[in-house]
Amino acid sequence: MTDSSWPTDERPRERLLAHGAQSLSDAELLAIFLRTGTTGMPVMALARHLIDEFSGLRGLMTASRRQFLQVKGLGTAKYAQVQAAMEMARRVMDEPLRQGDPLRSPADTRRFLTSRLGTYPHEVFAGLFLDNRHRVIQYRELFRGTIDGAAVYPREVVRQALEDNAAAVIFAHNHPSGVAEPSQADISLTRRLKEALGLVDIRVLDHMVIGHGEVISLAERGLM
């Protein structure tokens, strides 16, 4: 069932066109994306059900294929649509930090790292490797772990930085819990990495911790 049987001013698509996408709820945006419901469940009811089932849009958009297909009425076609939408959003966020471009602002860096790391259900430690003019050489996800943490090996980080001929690096990792507050272990690791890279004249500019809707800079906190 579609939304065509609703009063015109209550249909999500018409409300979007009249008032803008920002005026719609998460469920209404999802209903437009889904287009149709399932047998016995109109599209808005399905959208609300999915928001509840996955605890919000973030949970839905980052669900694994197995989790997604466990929900009645969702198939591989819808899963492919979700993945395509996620990748398009990620590429838009990536545009300010393409290879060879200089870092324009801390805000661009935050947005880029959030788009890359903010949706993982497990911890990922990454590096943004830069040349001596702070132009992007490469973004690399260096270590992956569990929901509780990822093991990081300074020797491997130094090797990768030298291989990329980097002059500076910005580190980042996500907290799957959603709380971006850096731990004492995060601070200690940053200082160890800074010391190890300093031996080969590579500067550590920052280490950012990515939560849900929040990014904390250890450099801004004076914790480097």
Swiss-Prot record:
GO terms for molecular function: metal ion binding; metallopeptidase activity. Keywords: Hydrolase, Metal-binding, Metalloprotease, Protease, Zinc. Zn(2+) binds at residues 173, 175, 186. The lineage of its organism: Bacteria, Pseudomonadati, Pseudomonadota, Gammaproteobacteria, Pseudomonadales. It comes from the Bacteria. Gene3D superfamilies: Cytidine Deaminase, domain 2 (3.40.140.10). Residues 102-224 form the MPN domain. A motif (JAMM motif) lies at residues 173-186. InterPro entries: MPN, RadC_JAB, RuvA_2-like, UPF0758, UPF0758_CS, UPF0758_N. GO terms for biological process: proteolysis. This is UPF0758 protein Maqu_3564. It holds the Pfam family UPF0758_N. Belongs to the UPF0758 family. The keyword Zinc applies.
